Amino acid sequence: KDELKQHDYSSDSLEIIHTPDSISMDESPKEAVVNKPNASVLVAASLVSNGKADALVSAGSTGSVVLSAAKHISRIPGVKRTAIATVYPTLNEFKRDDHLALMVDIGANVESSAKELVLFAIMGSTYVANVRGVGSPKSALLNIGEEETKGSEKMQTAYRMLKEVPSLNFSGNIEGKDILRGMADVIVTEGFVGNIVIKTLEGTAMAASHLGKLAFRARFSWKLGLFFLRKGLRRIREVTDYAEYGGAPLLGFEKMVIIAHGRSSAKAVSNAIKLAGKSVRDKVCETMAQKIGELDFQPK
């Protein structure tokens, strides 16, 4: 409250609820959720569950957010495993509606069944259509080859099932070399693979930035070249800055859950809240539930 007194805000639109505990980044999420029922993220999840809040936004540890949401917030009927999604910039070679693509899952689950991958595609496509405003978003299954017969039996089954979902604009398999080209709006994968892909992209961006700094110090001609490229480089930083996008949606609950980066700035948290608000206003979770309810199967 003392901190808020330094800022201009409407007290009618902000309620502060004190919590005696919090879950740190280095704690075991599973143990903390059990031993700290009054931790801030658990209290926030319970407020969403009982209708006193419409969405949950947290910059806490991913595990604690996922487990807190699972403890208090109901899943969409038919969804047994939720999934974390995140947007990432593409080259947009195919001039799609959005230069960003959504990857789902990026770590909520290590493995997923073929039917669960189908649900991830439906939830991801619904999110992109409603939140990003992409018309008929194209979804693709991350695999080791483009052909329908590529990959494990599970991936082949997922491919066949995805083709049969009327609400999906499924384009087939996509290989790792193509995910930055912008061939699809939604990339579906298991969490183990998705997490490695996203962190590899983050590491590549960091390496490119480091190489640019080395070049800037190495030669005057290179420094001059970077000077003329500064506007373009600034634009690249903007589209790769996680603060611009707020956070990663945790898909599969009846209420929207947004997981912000642990190092989120004020701008990132603000954008995460705006993202949650837009999701609520556009009834994203309700639309996901409707589309999943239209399926002829239930996940095992």
What are these regions (language model features)?
Residues 1-31, 50, 55-180, 194-269, ...:
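Anion-binding alpha/beta catalytic cores of soluble intermediary-metabolism enzymes, centered on
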Residues 191:
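Conserved catalytic block of serine-dependent lipid acyl chemistry
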Residues 36-52, 159:
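Short, well-structured alpha-helical segments in soluble
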Residues 282:
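Flexible, acidic glycine-rich loops studded with aromatic residues
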